[in-house]
């Protein structure tokens, strides 16, 4: 896609064509092929590069809904691209790289691959938030998202380095084996592991815009282009919830007594702030931002249960959240086109 865009968008012989819509449909076709491969899963459960990435039923389930939600977000953005005269094909390239980061994040089974996948996703989202260059609100949203996102990435990296320092490994599987039985010991390794886990949890909660790390979300959603706000609200949250579940329910499940009530508190806080914060809003995009904060709280409460039934509830809620959010944002975009309003408030 990148070569196609670079070569043909600068071709004078072809009249310098605008390739955003064409590139978008090509990428939708690629996503459909990826969806078919994921559903068929010809390889089956497996690990890649010494357990750096894994493929299992949980991973396939999450990937299917990431791809479906991504297709919807790309298709509904075509009219917005035409109305706003966005002629840069890089819009689709950035979306494709961020989706690739989310798919890799879902398969991550190592602290290094987890961090690299999050950064691949985040760096593209920073640019997409500020993609509407003529809007000061979009530029502000991109800058704010970049600064606070860099802070959360630093917190996440610090937590990962602590866990590596106290365990000597970055593999989720090896860390899970080492954490078994540590809860009965009062030694330095146990305390260091808890501190590292706390920093990692804070970094991921920051990315998900869960309480108390939700401050950036309404401002970024309001300033970003509307299709990008829809993308922020749906797709990254699915991948991050999957990562959060894998870390806390699989890797550190033996330490549930140490993190369960903290996650439960964040869950209750997100539900309360999402519900009552939305009542104060007069702009629809800020209201939807608070709505997404509340939905993150509902998903976190399933993780805080620490059981298989709780995880099943989270997966069911992901499906409902994806359908509801897609319908809501699509309706919002269609209303803006009918009223000929370039920027939805």
Where are these regions (language model features)?
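Alpha-helical transmembrane segments of multi-pass membrane proteins predominantly involved
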Residues: 1-345
């Amino acid at each position: 896609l990148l070569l196609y865009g670079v070569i043909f968008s600068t071709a004078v012989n072809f009249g310098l064509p605008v390739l955003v819509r064409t590139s978008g449909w090509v990428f939708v076709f690629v996503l459909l092929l990826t969806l078919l491969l994921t559903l068929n899963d010809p390889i089956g459960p497996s690990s890649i590069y010494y357990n750096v990435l894994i493929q299992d039923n949980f991973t396939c389930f999450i990937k299917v809904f990431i791809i479906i939600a991504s297709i919807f977000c790309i298709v509904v953005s075509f009219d917005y691209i035409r109305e706003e005269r966005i002629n840069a094909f890089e819009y689709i390239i950035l979306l494709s790289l961020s989706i690739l980061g989310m798919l890799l994040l879902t398969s991550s089974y190592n602290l290094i691959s987890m961090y690299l996948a999050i950064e691949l996703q985040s760096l593209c989202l920073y640019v997409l938030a500020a993609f509407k260059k003529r809007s000061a609100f979009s530029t502000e949203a991109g800058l704010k998202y970049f600064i606070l996102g860099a802070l959360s990435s630093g917190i996440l990296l610090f937590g990962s380095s602590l866990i590596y320092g106290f365990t000597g490994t970055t593999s989720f599987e090896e860390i899970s084996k080492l954490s078994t039985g540590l809860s009965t010991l009062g030694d330095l390794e146990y305390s260091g592991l808890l501190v590292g886990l706390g920093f990692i949890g804070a970094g991921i909660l920051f990315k998900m815009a869960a309480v108390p790390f939700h401050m950036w979300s309404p401002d970024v959603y309001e300033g970003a282009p509307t299709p990008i706000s829809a993308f922020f609200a749906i797709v990254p949250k699915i991948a991050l919830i999957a990562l959060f579940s894998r870390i806390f329910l699989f890797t550190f499940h033996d330490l549930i007594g140490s993190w369960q009530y903290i996650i439960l508190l964040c869950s209750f806080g997100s539900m309360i702030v999402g519900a009552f914060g939305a009542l104060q809003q007069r702009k629809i995009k800020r209201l939807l931002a608070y709505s997404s904060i509340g939905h993150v709280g509902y998903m976190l409460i399933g993780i805080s249960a620490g059981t298989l039934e709780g995880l099943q509830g989270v997966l069911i809620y992901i499906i409902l959240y994806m359908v509801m959010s897609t319908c809501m944002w699509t309706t919002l975009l269609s209303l803006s086109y009918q009223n000929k309003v370039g920027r939805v408030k």
